Amino acid sequence: MAKKSKALRAAIEKIDATKAYSVEEAVALAKETSFAKFDATVEVAYNLNIDVKKSDQQIRGAMVLPNGTGKTARVLVFAKGAKAEEATAAGADFVGSDELVAKINGGWLDFDVVIATPDMMAVVGRLGRVLGPRNLMPNPKTGTVTMDVTKAVGESKAGKVNYRADKAGNVHVPIGKVSFDTEKLVENFKALNTVIAAAKPAASKGAYITNLSVTTTMGPGVKVDSASF
């Protein structure tokens, strides 16, 4: 632990805490100050001036990053008949119905994304207590409740990320790995920022993005100037 603390202190010393960096500078600095011994995830953190208690100010959705996330998602699809065959052909890792419900209720969770056709939601609903807390419950807003399973599976495999504001208006989204070229991370970051900016509720007054930073797994946060996009 002492070694990690020393590494973190050294990383923090490279960052000017009083400065908001341009997106390019911030991403490069986040990569430079990453000290994890594995290919750390690069994550963007927003604090938004919204009141999530109001239904018209909730921020939630999904998008496909232009350069992916660096992680191949394990996709599970609840579907039957022709749609099950379509999901398998699209590259889904697991496809089924009640047998998957039983397996998941038994403790199996070796998947990253859950997709369902609308007619299967009554079956999937039985997994609410398991999937809900893990943000794995299929939802129309994120494109995971759909009849177009080919598109849903393809997007999930291509680097689709979900975003959702918590009770304090914070949104955390991974944009890639430290091993990515800085340019690719910046491109992902800018694509994400375009989506988040466009999601501003009409009822949100004043500054919308009140704080923005980029960080890596275990690494320090680097403040980003939202006007640099």
From Swiss-Prot:
GO MF terms held by the record: rRNA binding; structural constituent of ribosome; tRNA binding
Gene Ontology annotations of biological process type: regulation of translation; translation
Keyword entries, A-Z: Repressor, Ribonucleoprotein, Ribosomal protein, RNA-binding, rRNA-binding, Translation regulation, tRNA-binding
One Gene Ontology cellular component: large ribosomal subunit
Keyword Disulfide bond (UniProt): no
The keyword DNA-binding is assigned to this record: no
InterPro entries noted in UniProt: Ribosom_uL1_bac-type (IPR005878), Ribosomal_uL1 (IPR002143), Ribosomal_uL1-like (IPR023674), Ribosomal_uL1/biogenesis (IPR028364), Ribosomal_uL1_3-a/b-sand (IPR016095), Ribosomal_uL1_CS (IPR023673)
NCBIfam families cross-referenced by the UniProt entry: rplA_bact (TIGR01169)
Job of this protein: Binds directly to 23S rRNA. The L1 stalk is quite mobile in the ribosome, and is involved in E site tRNA release. Protein L1 is also a translational repressor protein, it controls the translation of the L11 operon by binding to its mRNA.
Subunit and interaction comment: Part of the 50S ribosomal subunit.
UniProt family annotation: Belongs to the universal ribosomal protein uL1 family.
PANTHER family: 54S RIBOSOMAL PROTEIN L1, MITOCHONDRIAL (PTHR36427), LARGE RIBOSOMAL SUBUNIT PROTEIN UL1M (PTHR36427:SF3)
Name of this protein: Large ribosomal subunit protein uL1
The species this protein was found in: Lactococcus lactis subsp. cremoris (strain MG1363)
Gene name as annotated: rplA
